[in-house]
């Protein structure tokens, strides 16, 4: 009976428990389902707000830039949806090579971080579209973007490629009316370049981490550009100056002063003066005596205008005339190309596509320009037939692209003044003037050259006046402009003395004249080749065939960002790290570092684009040789981390040891030779002569919380940190923080950290209680849209420098913030001081 009763009780209890459990489970499930449903609904709502799917018939146009999309949308109007991809949407993965070198070079392309939503948005719009027009830029990168978008949309839709070299209503409509197929060969060319860059960078960089220091990198093109600056530095250091002399005097006739200069012992052969005694003897021979005029030569010289801008020439002239870096030039040009809001004309693209090596002008633009020149300057300034220019290295006058030019002669620099920012106005005027001058008539210059004789020694002087200015009325290239200001002759091979104002008085053969200021000798020393500046390094890369015009700005930025090159007095100087890495790469990878090899790759890429050679063959040929070189370098490249370089500088701490240069994980530093008995270390730098200067310690603004002594700012594998100066006696170590309180928890500050991939981020020190973190450096600047207390710094090729709210993504142009204004004022001051010194 007891057993039966217990059994019944157990059954009842089990039933009740099961019932309760089922109820609880049902409640939990219902709760979870409700949450999921709410999330989905919210997500859909957000998506609709972000960009609802339009109803009705429409065609879809995909471009790569939001500002370009905005301009084009206004041109096309109803019946079109325009969306931006914000640059590339797919690339090789960051976590692995992404290229199967064993299996026919299959490539693993993945969506770029943060682009998933953008891809989904394009796919959603594509579903309802009748026709899809892909309109990224007309270069290889633009073609790659178009192919990647087409792959994500799929083959079920009608997809066309549209290309235009100007963001104007006429150009865009013409492109839409005349669509073309996607260019597979051009895409193959871009893929080849990307894979070659990945193979070189991904395979060589780890060897440098092991042998030199972590975090540095090699690149197929950037390393060759580094070689240019490094070898120029070697030339400068090896240069031995040589003494030489010149003899100058001054004459004056009819109240016109002019300078004369020693030429030689005959009127036909120039004599270089290298002997001081010989020079002094000539000065003594002619002193107090008359100079007889032996010959007066007068000739009319014609000077031709130069072509409109290519990318490289624009970068060079903007550097020489405006003081712009290549990067700054391209950022400003990008905005002028994509569209500027004009008060009386709405959104307008003001210049044609700015990445080009063509000097061609479209026939309709050429016709408009000739009409403009005749109307504004008169028929004397217009040549009888258009000036024709050939692309460098080509016999063709015609090619598919155009030079950089204004899109419309309606928008004169004066017309758009007030609508453009200062940098935009300067660059637009430069492009405008160069374009107009390229189709103007020749300048005619009357030149006079006079030869004098005194005691068997010959002297010369020259003067010139502009008889007809022609194209010089509008534009003169930087080099010619400087020569013109000096009163000199910008295209004469011989450097001759000249009249200061360009004029000579009336001088006749057989006439004798005395010196107003007696001839005297001047001592000179030959100079080493100059270090590269922005203009000359772009010119050198173009002449050597290194990279493409569209890549020059990023190449120059890369070698600076990597710490291989620094800018001193507006010239590029390789750092110690840059010199070391360059020499090691040249020794271990002679083919990759060969300028001719890099130029040869560019030719192969052109052949792939023309369909003359298969892209996989190029990769196979490269890899078969490169793989062998890689294995050899792993074994034979020197390990700098194990080397000690004595400096001859006594240790400041123990005064007994000597500082040695050592290589650590973060570069070179000075360490006492008595280590471990003395742990004194210092950062240092070398000046241009190679002298070592010990840098003062960098102290943090707060004291050590443990012992009260100063905290030193140090650099480690994961970025900067602070450590007590009394280390190792006091082992206090803290993160490097910015003086900005976290707006989320209002307790922590933002600490600077570096990820395992070398990228910096800023996280709250109150972690894990507060997980606030930013990939961009925070600034204490209230967001104008949502009021959030900080904004993050960002810089992109298309939009330039900005502060962006991490919450609502609202953006403010950097130049409109107090930080940007302070930076601009500092930069302006530096540029003015450079101009004054030059």
Model-assigned labels for residue ranges:
Residues 68, 72, 114-125, 138-149, ...:
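Helical mechanochemical/support elements of P-loop NTPase systems and associated helical scaffolds
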Residues 2, 39-194, 203, 263-264, ...:
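Intrinsically disordered, low-complexity regulatory segments
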Residues 74, 121-300, 405-467:
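Phosphate-backbone binding and catalysis cores of DNA-processing enzymes
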Residues 193-203, 221, 251-253, 301-313, ...:
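Core structural elements
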Residues 239-260, 291-332, 670-674, 722:
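C-terminal accessory/connector segments of nucleic-acid motor ATPases
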Residues 2, 22, 26, 30, ...:
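Basic, low-complexity terminal or inter-domain segments flanking catalytic cores
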Residues 293-296, 305-318, 345-353, 528-540:
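Short acidic, hydrophobic short linear motifs in intrinsically disordered regions
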Residues 57, 137-138, 213-217, 298-307, ...:
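Conserved short loop/turn motifs at secondary-structure junctions
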